[in-house]
């Protein structure tokens, strides 16, 4: 059964490594050393719920509900455009230190709300956990399925805590004005690219619904 664990771990790691909204947010909180371990835990717990739902049967709901998929997609597009705009505005600020200080004033609950939006309004999360993991893990018998899910969840916990701790450790180098400008530009551009990609997928979904 251990082979199913490592299969799940490898697949989970492959899906979570690319830079996306979750990773960017965890990295930024680590650099600020602002509730970064709490955010890593909440991201990992969110993945636990989504992965479990996808592997143990939730994928059927998304696949059979094209309107739900469209709603999630366009909600994600709107959020990613807003999130990317915020990062680019911070990067282009004439007083980056003041802009960063304003971000640091955010309270715990606002940070948690942003994390939940970054996670649950990202359609790629549902495609990864419900469609990809659901189609692969859902075909297994119950015992291998549990090991497969455990491996995938382990990859998520290891990655988010590792990213948060590494970003906090590198904070003295990454918290400079130049580094912050580069990071925010990178995050903003990536968020907009993902948003435009999702918008194209959303248009295709809407076209399929009305034809």
UniProtKB/Swiss-Prot annotation:
Transferase recorded as keyword: no
Keywords carried by this UniProt record: Amino-acid transport, Cell inner membrane, Cell membrane, Membrane, Transmembrane, Transmembrane helix, Transport
Record-level Gene Ontology MF annotations: L-arginine transmembrane transporter activity
Pfam families, alphabetized: LysE
Compartments reported by the entry: Cell inner membrane
Topology relative to the membrane: Multi-pass membrane protein
Residue ranges of the TM segments: 1-21, 37-57, 68-88, 111-131, 147-167, 179-199
Coiled coil: none
Record family assignment: Belongs to the LysE/ArgO transporter (TC 2.A.75) family.
Protein's UniProt name: Arginine exporter protein ArgO
Protein's organism: Salmonella enteritidis PT4 (strain P125109)
Gene that produces this protein: argO
């Amino acid at each position: 059964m251990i082979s199913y664990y490592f299969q799940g771990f490898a697949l989970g790691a492959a899906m979570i490594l690319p830079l996306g909204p979750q990773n960017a947010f965890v990295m930024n909180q680590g650099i600020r050393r602002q509730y970064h371990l709490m955010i890593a835990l909440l991201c990992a717990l969110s993945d636990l719920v989504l992965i479990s739902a996808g592997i143990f049967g939730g994928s059927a709901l998304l696949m059979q509900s094209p309107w739900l998929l469209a709603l999630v997609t366009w909600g994600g597009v709107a959020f990613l455009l807003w999130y990317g705009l915020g990062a680019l505005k911070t990067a282009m600020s004439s007083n980056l230190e003041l802009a960063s200080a304003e971000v640091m004033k955010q309270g715990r609950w606002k940070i948690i709300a942003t994390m939940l939006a970054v996670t649950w309004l990202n359609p790629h999360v549902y495609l990864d956990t419900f469609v990809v993991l659901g189609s692969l893990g859902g075909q297994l018998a119950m015992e291998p399925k549990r090991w497969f899910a455990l491996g995938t969840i382990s990859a998520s916990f290891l990655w988010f805590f590792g990213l948060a701790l590494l970003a906090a450790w590198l904070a003295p180098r990454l918290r400079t004005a130049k580094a912050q400008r580069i990071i925010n530009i990178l995050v903003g551009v990536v968020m907009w690219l993902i948003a435009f990609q999702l918008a194209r997928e959303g248009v295709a979904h809407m076209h399929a619904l009305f034809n």
